Amino acid sequence: MVLATLGSSPFVGNKHGTGEPNVLALHGWGRSGSDFDRVLVGTNALALHLPGFGSAGAPPEAWSPGDYAEHLASALVGHCQVTLVGHSFGGRVAIRLAARYPHLVQSLVLTGVPLIKRTAAKKAPVPFRLAKRARSLGILSESRMDILRNRYGSADYRNAQGVMRGVLVAAIGEDYFADAAQIDVPVTMVWGEWDQPAPLAGAQKALEYFPHATLRVVPGAFQLLEGNLEQELAVALHDALNA
C-alpha cells in the first residue's frame, strides 16, 4: 500500500486509486487507515492514519474530535469536495467536519459512531472517587493517580498513552445530534445489529436529526469492520459516489 499525504499537510494515509482522492476515510479508536483496505477497492481515496494512531505521531496536545476536524479542514483547502467515510472515532471527526465546513464535504458514510454522550453504567469504585478527590486537593501524586487510572479505567483508557488519554476523555464526553441537524449533505449510516460501543438505537435516533439520512442495518454484525459489515459499507460508499 502506498503512503501519501493529504495535500501539503502532515496528514498521512494509505492511497487508493490513481486519481485525486475524492474519498477520505477516517478510522476508529485504536485502529488505522488499513481497516479500509477492502472497503476502498475501486475508489480514489485516502485512508488516513489519524494523529496518534497507526504510523502517525500523536497530536501536540489532547485534541477533541472538533480539533481533528479543524486541522483536517485546513488540509482540505483547495482540495475537491470529499465523501467522508467515518468509523467509530473517525465518524465523530467526520460529523464535526461536515457540520462546520459543509463546502468541503460531498456526502457522509458512517458506521459504528458513538453519537450519544457516554454515561457511566455505575459509579466509579469508592477508592477511585476518593483518589480523584485527594488528587484535586494536591494530597495524591500524579504518578499514584495514574496507577489508579490504569486499575479502574476502561480498556481503551488503559491502552492509551500520554496525550491520547486526554483525546479519549474529550471524545466520550460529547454527543453529535446538534451537529447532525446542521448537515445538509446526504448521510448513509451502515450499522451492525449488535454494535455495543455504538448501539443501533443511537443511529435510529440520529435519523430524527440528520436532514437527509438513511440507515442500513446489517443483521448479526457487531462494530469491527469485518464480514458483512465491511461488505455493506463498501456497497454504501459506491452508492454514495454514484448518486
Regions found by a protein language model. Give the residues of each.
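Conserved HGGG/HGGXW glycine-rich cap/lid loop of the alpha/beta-hydrolase fold
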Residues: 14-57
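Flexible "cap/lid" loop of the alpha/beta hydrolase fold
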Residues: 95-100, 104-137
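Short beta-strand/loop motif that positions the catalytic acidic residue
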Residues: 183, 189-191, 195
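Conserved alpha/beta-hydrolase catalytic His-Asp/Glu region
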Residues: 132-185
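Active-site loop/oxyanion-hole signature of alpha/beta-hydrolase fold enzymes
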Residues: 9, 47-85, 235
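Catalytic histidine-centered segment of alpha/beta-hydrolase-like enzymes
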Residues: 221-232
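Gly/Ala-rich beta-loop-alpha elbow adjacent to hydrolase catalytic centers
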Residues: 86-90, 94
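Alpha/beta-hydrolase fold catalytic core
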Residues: 1-23, 40-44, 77, 106, ...
